[in-house]
Amino acid sequence: MALQPVTRRSVPEEVFEQIATDVLTGEMPPGEALPSERRLAELLGVSRPAVREALKRLSAAGLVEVRQGDVTTVRDFRRHAGLDLLPRLLFRNGELDISVVRSILEARLRNFPKVAELAAERNEPELAELLQDSLRALDTEEDPIVWQRHTLDFWDHVVDSAGSIVDRLMYNAFRAAYEPTLAALTTTMTAAAKRPSDYRKLADAICSGDPTGAKKAAQDLLELANTSLMAVLVSQASRQ
């Protein structure tokens, strides 16, 4: 029996989770009015301050709109939420949502080659040593999950070297969403994505100051990884 640590949530967090889940699954569609604060407290068996705190969090996450003295309504999270919502969207009822994985991988393919190009243009001397450390880890690591974390570290260095705060913040959101999926994708990654030579080719292009070569190497690496990953995920889903 695989036991997991027990997580003790606060009451406001429990309220937040219940309402957020209903919003994200469509159980509560955009525009629907929530019960009053008093009624929510009665239905959930909690205090009004706990409900109030949960509603503040839901509002900050772009899931509801709270109007003082008026009803609280569900917002369309696709229009109002931020990238920090991605980790919640990846898993629905404990299952990996393939459509969200596909969106993340497509966004990675569109953005990361440009980041590699920028890093090669800047060609910061300290980047070479950092990437070599990552490459050594990729060459020797046996554990597939840890290996994938090393690839994320590799891209961490590339993103920092590109010098774009927007790309940096987008990468933070990507990593926060992607990293929790590593255990679920271990089998796929072992077979399809463990290609340290592709990362070495990319590192060589960046460190030699070759923007065109770096962009192409990143494009090739990510296209292959995306194609292999999605093929296995779709195959697994069809068997369920």
UniProtKB/Swiss-Prot annotation:
**What induces this protein's gene, according to its Swiss-Prot or TrEMBL record?**
Expressed in mid-log phase cells and in gamma-interferon stimulated, mouse macrophage-like cell line J774.
Q: Where is the HTH gntR-type domain?
A: 9-77
Q: Which domain of life is it from?
A: Bacteria
Pfam entry (one): FCD
Q: What CDD domains does its record include?
A: WHTH_GntR (cd07377)
What function is annotated for this protein?
Negatively regulates the expression of its operon as well as expression of end (endonuclease 4).
Name of the molecule in the record? HTH-type transcriptional regulator Mce2R
Q: Name the source organism.
A: Mycobacterium tuberculosis (strain ATCC 25618 / H37Rv)
Quote the gene name from the UniProt entry. mce2R
